[in-house]
Amino acid sequence: MKVHATVGNEAIALVYIVETSSGHLVECVESVQPPLPSEKKWVLLVSTMFGCPIGCLMCDAGGYYHGKPTKDEIFSQIDFLVGKRFPDGEIPCEQFKIQFARMGEPSLNLQVLDVLQELPRRYRAPGLMPSISTIAPAGAERFFDPLLEIKQEEYAGGHFQFQVSLHTTDIALRDQFIPVKKWSFAQIGDYGERFYTPGDRKITLNFALAQGMPVDPMVLLNFFDPDKFLIKITPLNPTYRARENNLVSYVNHLSAEQ
């Protein structure tokens, strides 16, 4: 794997632009969560697509789409990041999170399922916790149904994080923000009821909240059981696409870090 660029601060996060075996460029990231040292929590973010076809209003990855990495190309990102810190493949971190959330919509690449099945046997990592972040596109049942089985077989007892990006409870604004066909709140809630079992982490409903994008708790309560779902509100990153679309974060980045 060829590294084309590295940006960031090792004390917080490093972003790598790398070239895969097929000649495509992707981003992958390693990060920590101060004040926790990496021995406590180490987080990797890997790309599941070359760009992204979704076109969310705030996401720079939607500017182009050139296909899907194979299982080996996804693993090459993880192997690269792991090899820099733990070349023997033994990862002693209390929490070793791998987020399939850098570039691309993971549910549109079935190779991600193969990666999830193999992960527990590829590294010696007792703290392993994969994390899938999705917009829940329509027609992705052939990903989500086997994902439920893989979670039960390989990651039961709170070793898996499932996150759905909603961004607002206003349906019309959600359709503008995420301009593709996707599951309704009712469909997401129904899947969550099947996905969650006692001992699991709660399913995260993520809101990268922009000004003017409402979050109505009563709407959420109509579809999502608070015993099985939680709400996460994060700052909207100041991307090129966000600026083009005049999106301003509702949450101040500096206050969110404190």
Positions of the model-derived regions?
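Conserved AdoMet/S-adenosylmethionine-binding subsite of the radical SAM
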Residues: 83-258
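A structure-centric signal for secondary-structure junctions around beta-strands
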Residues: 13, 25, 40-41, 53, ...
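Generic beta-structure capping elements
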Residues: 21, 31-33, 47-49, 135, ...
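Canonical Radical SAM [4Fe-4S] cluster-binding loop centered on the CxxxCxxC motif
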Residues: 32-76, 80
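Flexible, acidic/Gly-rich N-terminal and inter-domain linker regions that tether
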Residues: 1-42, 54
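Short linear Ser/Thr-Pro motifs
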Residues: 6-9, 47-48, 133
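Short secondary-structure boundary segments
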Residues: 4-10, 15, 74-77, 99, ...
